[in-house]
Amino acid sequence: MSVSKTNRIALFIDGANFYATTRTLGLDVDYKRVLKEFESRGTLVRAFYYTMISEDQNYVSLRPLVDWLVYNGFTVVKKVAKEFVDSAGHRKVKGKLEVELAVNAMELAKHIDEMFLFSGDGDFRSLVEAVQRRGVRVTVVSSFAAQPPMIADELRRQADAFIDLDTLRTKIGRDPSTRSM
């Protein structure tokens, strides 16, 4: 594949969905290698990472990753999860970042040629279609190889291209001998 450095690209990583997919695949992601891999595909305009944080834990477990991402070129979009107790007395966490991701994608569409959406969530099908109408090529990065598949069929069909995360294992997987993010 011939890649032009004038191809302006942006990454949109749905953190919760990406984490679930990589965990299902047993893939430990090295985010430095993610940047390197996608910078080789064009001029990286922006790399977004979307994540929920818990009110009571102040995102202690996510803090090292979030800090590393911020200091290494990612735009991290955080939202506090709303916690509640359902009618059965079970503690539930509610909150999504689909709207924030969609707004950022629509705003950035006029500045990019290609969007890489790291999510398998079918709720993004309409967003993909809207961005395509603005002349942006959309590649969805998720997994059909995972069991169960982590990509909604309608999202995969709408995208211009699909990359299975399993095929990127050697390019973005963490080298066990290193400790970088």
Regions of interest found by a model, annotated:
Residues D153, R157, A161, D166:
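Ligand/cofactor pocket segment of small-molecule handling proteins
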Residues M1-L97, E107, G122, R137, ...:
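Domain-level signal for Mg2+-assisted phosphodiester chemistry and nucleotide/NA-binding surfaces
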Residues Y50, F118, L165:
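Conserved residues at the C-terminal ends of beta-strands
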Residues N72, R134, L155-Q158:
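Short, structured coil segments at secondary-structure junctions
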Residues T43-V45, H111, Q158:
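Short loop/turn motifs at secondary-structure junctions
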Residues L101-H111:
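Acidic, metal-associated active-site segment
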